[in-house]
UniProtKB/Swiss-Prot annotation:
This is Flagellar hook-basal body complex protein FliE. It comes from Escherichia coli O9:H4 (strain HS). GO terms for biological process: bacterial-type flagellum-dependent cell motility. NCBIfam families: fliE. InterPro entries: FliE.
Length: 104
């Protein structure tokens, strides 16, 4: 009898999981556009570069509380994010060219 009760317990857990999954599926999913995500990523790259440039200007002007290592770290972050953006662009262009060269 305990084996049957164990199986019934597992079945009830599976049913509860299935019902919660159905409830989550019925909720409206936010639409995420590719263009919106790309624009947001470009904005983050731009913000990173602007912050690094501002930090470097503050250090150059001798403002207190701005350390050289912070400036160098911000400049490297900006450089890496720009290189990442360039590589993403290159991959997108390559994918576009591949799609355009496909036979219809």
């Amino acid at each position: 009898m305990s084996a049957i009760q164990g199986i019934e317990g597992v079945i009830s857990q599976l049913q509860a999981t299935a019902m919660s999954a159905r409830a989550q599926d019925s909720l409206p999913q936010p639409t995420i556009s590719f263009a919106g995500q790309l624009h947001a990523a470009l904005d983050r790259i731009s913000d990173t570069q602007t912050a690094a440039r501002t930090q470097a200007e503050k250090f150059t002007l001798g403002e207190p509380g701005v350390a050289l290592n912070d400036v160098m770290t911000d400049m490297q972050k900006a450089s890496v994010s720009m290189q990442m953006g360039i590589q993403v662009r290159n991959k997108l262009v390559a994918a576009y060219q591949e799609v355009m060269s496909m036979q219809v």
